């Protein structure tokens, strides 16, 4: 699930997984399996998810029908937790077992949001969770608290991922990867071909820059110090943030976020 499901994880992070059952299983039989899966992954170096998005959490191991009930409950909520759970599930990719179960559950989610403009807008509004770190004169706005760095994830990667995800969910797309979603949205006319190309290039540049920073720091960081970049790298970073900002505007207009 999450960045792993989208095929966009760089450094290994914590566990993000779930289990879809073809039929109900007695809790006493399921509990041991949940624990075994969790412990096996932990022994391989994948620490627990702080948000408990793991097989061992009963919330994330259910039948298709039970997940369907959850989707409708999450959509009815106006809080961030419900939107986050929908985003997590929508990005999921099957890695074992019957992939048809995941397809069926995702179709249930798509059916649940079809035509639900208010719920889709509530989901999409997270695109504005963080400001774009670009100033009035197109300068990069750094954070002194972070050592004069900019946060690539908050400033560019997340708004692109979530903005594209919201538009993809509205269209009922099955793709999970962000670049693949952009391509399909361009085919459907949501994006102009040129903007789709620019958006894909901006996203890939931000991801590459983050990976370079993680390799240099030997840690899962999203912070980059513009002062340590070349002039060309800073120019490309500004361009990437501006494209992410343009996507925000597309999402705001499409879902009338000024009303929320």
For each feature predicted by the language model, list its residue ranges.
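Structured core elements
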Residues: 18-20, 50, 208-210
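Conserved catalytic core of two-metal-ion nucleotidyltransferases
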Residues: 26-89, 96, 100-108, 112, ...
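Short glycine-enriched loops at secondary-structure junctions
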Residues: 1-6
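Catalytic metal-binding acidic patch
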Residues: 7-28
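Alpha-helical hydrophobic packing sites
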Residues: 16-18, 47, 255
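Conserved nucleotidyltransferase catalytic core and NTase-mimicking acidic/glycine-rich helix/loop elements
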Residues: 101-260
């Amino acid at each position: 699930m999450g960045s792993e499901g989208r095929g966009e994880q760089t450094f290994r992070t914590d566990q993000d997984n779930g289990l879809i059952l073809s039929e109900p299983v007695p809790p006493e039989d399921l509990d041991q399996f949940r624990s075994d899966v969790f412990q096996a992954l932990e022994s391989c170096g994948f620490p627990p998810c702080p948000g408990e998005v793991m097989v061992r959490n009963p919330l994330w191991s259910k039948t298709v029908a039970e997940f369907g009930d959850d989707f409708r409950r999450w959509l009815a909520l106006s809080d961030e937790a419900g939107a986050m759970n929908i985003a997590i599930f929508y990005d999921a990719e099957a890695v074992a077992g019957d992939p048809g179960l995941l397809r069926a559950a995702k179709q249930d989610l798509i059916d649940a949001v079809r035509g639900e403009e208010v719920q889709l807008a509530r989901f999409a509004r997270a695109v504005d969770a963080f400001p774009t770190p670009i100033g009035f004169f197109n300068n990069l706005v750094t954070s002194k608290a972070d050592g004069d760095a900019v946060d690539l994830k908050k400033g560019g990667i997340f708004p692109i991922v979530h903005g594209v995800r919201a538009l993809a969910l509205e269209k009922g797309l099955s793709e999970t990867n962000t670049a693949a979603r952009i391509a399909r949205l361009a085919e459907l006319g949501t994006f102009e071909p040129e903007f789709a190309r620019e958006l894909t290039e901006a996203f890939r540049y931000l991801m590459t820059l983050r990976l370079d920073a993680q390799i240099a720091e030997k840690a899962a960081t999203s912070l980059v110090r513009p002062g340590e970049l070349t002039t060309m790298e800073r120019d490309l970073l500004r361009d990437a943030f501006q494209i992410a900002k343009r996507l925000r505007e597309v999402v705001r207009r499409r879902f009338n976020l000024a009303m929320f």
